[in-house]
Structures are given as structure tokens and as C-alpha cells.
A protein has these predicted regions:
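N-terminal secretory signal peptides that target proteins for export/translocation
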Residues: 1-10
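Bacterial N-terminal signal peptides
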Residues: 11-26
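An N-terminally biased module of ancient metal coordination in phosphate/nucleic-acid-related enzymes
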Residues: 26-88
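Active-site gating/metal-coordination segments in enzymes
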Residues: 32, 78-161, 214-217, 223-224
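Hydrophobic faces of well-ordered beta-strands that scaffold small-molecule active sites
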Residues: 38-42, 69-71, 92-95, 128-129, ...
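Acidic/histidine-rich helix-loop elements
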Residues: 42-53, 101-107, 136, 219-223, ...
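Acidic (Asp/Glu)-rich catalytic clusters
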Residues: 58-62, 79-91, 114-124, 151-154, ...
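H/E-rich (His + Asp/Glu) clusters that bind or coordinate divalent metals
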Residues: 183, 191-306
Length: 306
């Protein structure tokens, strides 16, 4: 069978953002022809399930040869629903948002710890997260529910996907330093932080890995320049810490607005676009570094066999 591969560069205007260059990668290629990808950060939330099913999501990731996918759900159990649709590819993490309304008050609900322990003890979940902490907003880092989740990560030896929003790395540093036994996956590498702010965390906390989801031009926009070239600081960081960087799509729209009650989240409609963005900047790295960040780092981090 004839297989047509395209690797063209086009310039496009997208949603009012600046002119960007993208590669159209393998539009007509079969999934087996595309390099395997580990998407370390996706969601299956109640406001996504309204417009896309678990089976439709699995079809999307298979088509793009995403071999490993870490999912958290709101409510938490939706991660298990997506996992059930493809247990080989989907790795569920326990989200502290156990109901559709838990995002704002999870840290006041002791049921979070009960459900987390039950899910980890029975090996339903392979990790904890995504959990959000905002500097200057509740909860404080000494909150009993937050600390209890950290205790469970230590007890069951599972990774912890943590999202922090702060002006610099000093908000997260005490957390990773106080829990050296926990393997932290730092969501979005701190979001708005520059590479030179992220590097001290990697240097001082060898239990931290970073993932670069949502650092695309439509959300945090802090990874590449207007021509889609990887910024020098990130290029240097990836080359200096090639074993501790991963990436993912985080198909939530928009990542900074949170969930809405008046409209469904169509983030999965952007999945292919987000994935292509990450493949494009990864292609700028040395081949051995590209392969680690694209796939094998996640495989080792999660103890996945395939």
C-alpha cells in the first residue's frame, strides 16, 4: 500500500495569536509510521464527557500513536472510565477533585483521603494528581488533606503530579525538598516560569521531573518564539537534564480559565494540534534527547513496560 508522508512547513494565523510556523507531520501516515509518544498529561472531565466519549478519545490517541497516556479526571472516577477503554495505553491518576464541584474545596473534604487510599491500595490508580496550588490562595501547603495526599504518595510509592502557580520557583522548592521520597511530576514546569527559574528546582530536588504540557502558543506560550523555535533556555535545560523532562498535550480549553458551567470543554478537539506542536519543537533536539522526552522518560518514570 502506498503511504504518503508530508513534512511541510506552513505559516498560519490562529485565534488572533502571532504568526507561527508549523510542520504538517504525516497527515496520511499510518499510526505505525509515527514515532510513539508518551502524553504525560491529559484529562477526562465531566465537562468534556458531555461532548466526547472515552472510546472517541482512545481512537484519537491510537491514530496518533500515543502509546502512554496519563489521565486525571474530574470527578476522579472518570480517569478509571478512560482507563477501562484502553488499559494498555491509559494510566489513571487519582485526582483530589472527587466531584464536579470539588476543584474549589477539595482541601476541606476528608473523603478525598479516604477515596485516595482506597484507590491506591487496590491499585486502581497509579499516581496522584493533577493537584493545583496557587501562591497566596488556599490551601496552604500545611493543609492536612494536601499533606495526607503526600503521605499516601510516599506510602504507596506512586508519583505525584503537582501544578503550582507562583511568580518564581521558591513556592514549590520547600514542597519537593521536604518530601525527598516522592517522585514529583511538576506540571507545565511551573507554567509561566522561565527555564532559568526551573533549573534550580531540578538542581536542588533530584526527586522532581518536569513536563512541558500547556506551554503551547495558545496557553502559557513560554516555550518557543514566534517562529516556533525552542527558546535557548529551554534548549539548554533539555540538553542538561535529558532524563528528567517529559511533555504532554493537556487538552483542556483554556487551561487558565478553569471549568465552566455554561459550556462544555472542547479541549479534545485541539488534541492533534497540540500534539503536532510538541512534536515540532521536540524535532529540534538531538535525536537521543528527543526520544527520551518524547517517550522513554515517561516509560521509565511510570515503570511502564510498553
Amino acid at each position: 500500500m502506498l503511504r504518503l508522508h508530508l513534512n511541510l512547513c506552513v505559516k498560519v494565523w490562529i485565534s488572533g495569536f502571532s504568526l507561527l510556523t508549523f510542520s504538517i507531520y504525516g497527515i496520511f501516515a499510518h499510526a505505525a509510521d509515527i514515532k510513539p509518544f508518551a502524553d504525560i498529561h491529559v484529562h477526562f472531565n465531566w465537562d468534556q464527557k458531555e461532548i466526547i466519549s472515552a472510546q472517541q478519545i482512545v481512537a484519537k490517541i491510537k491514530k496518533q500513536n500515543v502509546a502512554i497516556t496519563v489521565v486525571s479526571g474530574t470527578p476522579s472516577a472518570l480517569a478509571l472510565e478512560l482507563h477501562a477503554a484502553d488499559p494498555k495505553r491509559i494510566i489513571p491518576f487519582f485526582s483530589p477533585y472527587i466531584t464536579a464541584a470539588s476543584r474549589k474545596n477539595w482541601y476541606l473534604d476528608k473523603n478525598v483521603l479516604l477515596q485516595a487510599e482506597q484507590g491506591l491500595a487496590t491499585k486502581q490508580y497509579a499516581g496522584i494528581g493533577e493537584l493545583h496550588l496557587w501562591a497566596g490562595m488556599p490551601p496552604r501547603t500545611d493543609n492536612p488533606v494536601f499533606q495526607g495526599l503526600l503521605d499516601l504518595a510516599e506510602k504507596y510509592h506512586v508519583p505525584f503530579l503537582i501544578h503550582t502557580e507562583a511568580a518564581d520557583q521558591r513556592f514549590f522548592l520547600p514542597i519537593c525538598q521536604s518530601r525527598p521520597q516522592i517522585r514529583f511530576l511538576w506540571a507545565h514546569a511551573g507554567g509561566t516560569l522561565a527555564a532559568d527559574q526551573v533549573k534550580p528546582v531540578l538542581k536542588q530536588c533530584n526527586n522532581v521531573w518536569v513536563e512541558l504540557s500547556a506551554r503551547d502558543p495558545w496557553r502559557y506560550n513560554t516555550l518557543v518564539d514566534d517562529n516556533n523555535n525552542l527558546l535557548p533556555g529551554w534548549l539548554a535545560l533539555c540538553n542538561e537534564y535529558p532524563d528528567r523532562v517529559m511533555t504532554g498535550t493537556d487538552p483542556v480549553w483554556s487551561v487558565r480559565k478553569g471549568q465552566r458551567w455554561d459550556a462544555a470543554d472542547d479541549g479534545w478537539d485541539h488534541f492533534e494540534q497540540l500534539l503536532e506542536f510538541h512534536r515540532s519543537w521536540l524535532a529540534q533536539l538531538p535525536p537521543n534527547v528527543e526520544e527520551k522526552i518524547r517517550f522513554s522518560n515517561a516509560k521509565r518514570f511510570l515503570f511502564a513496560e510498553n
